[in-house]
């Protein structure tokens, strides 16, 4: 969890630079890739993270480190983002890498916007999440720290080679396994799904069922929950074969569980309560 200073630094930096990053349009693809690469470099060097976040070090010195590291090899917007980040205060040195990754995903979202693929990528990430729930062995290998990042990416490509995924979906999914960042693979994919949902101005409604939802069911759920929360919602359909009947629906912290298992558990609690002597 990030400290207060890091949360403020991340939010203010992204809020201030979002319009410029959005305006890069197709160039955002290059910027996002560069930021993912920088995230990996930072993760691999705590010394570099400390050099770029040391509060006692002048900002000019930190920018000099950036210039030596990146030179003229990156997009000007990438350099502007990094310069802004090193000028801010961070609770922990490693939090700057988190902020760089945030910007990387933002850049990919803006590229998706520019190419009219935002909704497609959001849906594909949700479908990918559901597919991997049913592939526990593959899922485990995608965040296997004993394997090389190259091996994990190769596995992902082999498993999903038959899918015609948008290149943004592919890049985000590969980033999630290439640079694990102390997270399980599906945690990263879910984080990206949530970011896309917020980006599109929607609320995320996660619906877990034993079999895929039909289009009519998704349409009805969108209508019901859009009316309930007062804004458009996105249905994140999760398929979990272990679910017995019904649906488990989560909106933020609110969970509605009408699966058979949940109903049996509620019945069991009710019986126990009634059987308890007064």
From Swiss-Prot:
Coiled coil region boundaries: none
Molecular function per GO: proton-transporting ATP synthase activity, rotational mechanism
Task performed by this protein: F(1)F(0) ATP synthase produces ATP from ADP in the presence of a proton or sodium gradient. F-type ATPases consist of two structural domains, F(1) containing the extramembraneous catalytic core and F(0) containing the membrane proton channel, linked together by a central stalk and a peripheral stalk. During catalysis, ATP synthesis in the catalytic domain of F(1) is coupled via a rotary mechanism of the central stalk subunits to proton translocation. This protein is part of the stalk that links CF(0) to CF(1). It either transmits conformational changes from CF(0) to CF(1) or is implicated in proton conduction.
Pfam families found in the cross-reference section: OSCP
Subunit structure, as described in the record: F-type ATPases have 2 components, F(1) - the catalytic core - and F(0) - the membrane proton channel. F(1) has five subunits: alpha(3), beta(3), gamma(1), delta(1), epsilon(1). F(0) has three main subunits: a(1), b(2) and c(10-14). The alpha and beta chains form an alternating ring which encloses part of the gamma chain. F(1) is attached to F(0) by a central stalk formed by the gamma and epsilon chains, while a peripheral stalk is formed by the delta and b chains.
Matches recorded under PROSITE patterns: ATPASE_DELTA
Family to which the UniProt record says this protein belongs: Belongs to the ATPase delta chain family.
Alphabetical list of PANTHER family matching this protein: ATP SYNTHASE DELTA CHAIN
Compartment annotation: Cell membrane
Topology class, membrane: Peripheral membrane protein
Superkingdom as given in the UniProt entry: Bacteria
Protein's recorded name: ATP synthase subunit delta
GO cellular component term, pick one: plasma membrane
Annotated keywords: ATP synthesis, Cell membrane, CF(1), Hydrogen ion transport, Ion transport, Membrane, Transport
Organism: Bifidobacterium longum subsp. infantis (strain ATCC 15697 / DSM 20088 / JCM 1222 / NCTC 11817 / S12)
Keyword match tRNA-binding: no
């Amino acid at each position: 969890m990030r400290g207060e200073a890091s949360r403020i630094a991340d939010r203010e930096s992204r809020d201030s630079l979002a319009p410029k990053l959005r305006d890069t349009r197709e160039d955002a693809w290059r910027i996002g890739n560069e930021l993912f690469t920088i995230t990996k470099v930072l993760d691999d060097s705590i010394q570099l993270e400390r050099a770029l976040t040391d509060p006692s070090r002048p900002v000019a010195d930190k920018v000099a480190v950036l210039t030596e590291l990146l030179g003229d090899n990156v997009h000007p917007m990438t350099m502007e983002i990094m310069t802004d980040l090193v000028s801010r205060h961070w609770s922990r040195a490693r939090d700057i890498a988190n902020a760089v990754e945030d910007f990387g995903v933002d850049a990919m979202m803006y590229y998706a916007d520019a190419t009219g693929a935002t909704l497609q990528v959001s849906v594909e990430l949700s479908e990918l999440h559901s597919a991997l729930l049913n592939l526990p062995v593959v899922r485990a290998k995608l965040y296997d720290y004993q394997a090389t990042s190259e091996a994990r990416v190769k596995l992902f490509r082999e498993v999903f080679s038959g899918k015609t995924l948008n290149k943004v979906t592919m890049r985000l999914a590969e980033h999630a396994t290439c640079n694990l960042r102390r997270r399980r693979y599906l945690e990263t994919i879910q984080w990206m799904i949530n970011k896309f949902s917020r980006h599109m101005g929607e609320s995320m409604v996660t619906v877990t069922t034993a079999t895929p939802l039909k289009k009519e069911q998704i349409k009805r759920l969108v209508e019901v929950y859009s009316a309930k929360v007062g804004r458009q919602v996105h249905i994140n359909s999760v398929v979990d074969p272990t679910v017995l009947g019904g649906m488990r629906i989560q909106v933020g912290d609110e969970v509605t569980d009408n699966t058979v298992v949940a109903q049996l558990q509620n019945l069991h609690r009710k019986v126990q309560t009634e059987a308890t002597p007064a």
